[in-house]
Amino acid sequence: AWLDSFLSTRFDDYLPTISNPATSPEGSSRLSAYLTSGVLSVRQVKHAITTARQSPPEGVDVAVFRKNVDAFASRVSWRCHFVQRLEMETSMNERSINPELDEALGRVDDEQRFLAWAEGRTGWPFFDACMRSLRATGWINFRMRAMMQSVAAYTLWLPWQRSGQHLAKLFI
């Protein structure tokens, strides 16, 4: 039902809305929890995408619709790629690709900075709002997920493993 509603009624503005935290809750597919838990398979999603691309809803700009379909199909493929990488390289979420660089950077596991980051109390309004939204709903769009991890690792200089584990626990 959620996939059908996405492809038939919420899909018109997919590309313009997916990056914006204010519009992405409606404009994104929000299928990640269904895919992760196995309620929905990638095969089902790909089939629905193919069907939608061949038979766009009446009254839509077909070129725009197909551009959105192709972009969504690409995201589903990238999701599969990264799931496969994590399954093949099981230490990827614990060990850096370049351990020498991690050692040279000397990140500090500062508890105060970590808690401020994790609770959305950094003092940066946009970041804090995104973190509080994730904590309340269990979902945030992909650009904001990347921003949250970047703030932890590159701005607050926290170990990326701990912040990554924390984010993973928050996602539905």
What residue ranges belong to the model's regions?
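Alpha-helix N-cap/helix-initiation sites
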Residues: 66, 137, 141-146, 160
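Active-site-adjacent structural elements in folded domains
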Residues: 15-18, 60, 109-120, 125-139
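Short acidic (Asp/Glu) and glycine-rich catalytic loops that position anionic groups and cofactors
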Residues: 24-27, 46-47, 105-111, 144-147
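Hydrophobic alpha-helix feature that most strongly marks membrane-spanning transmembrane helices
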Residues: 50, 54, 81, 87, ...
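Active/binding-pocket-proximal capping segment
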Residues: 93, 99-105, 146-172
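Glycine/tryptophan-enriched, flexible segments
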Residues: 1-100
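Contiguous, well-ordered alpha-helical segments that form the cores/surfaces of helical PPI scaffolds
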Residues: 29-32, 71, 112-115, 125-135, ...
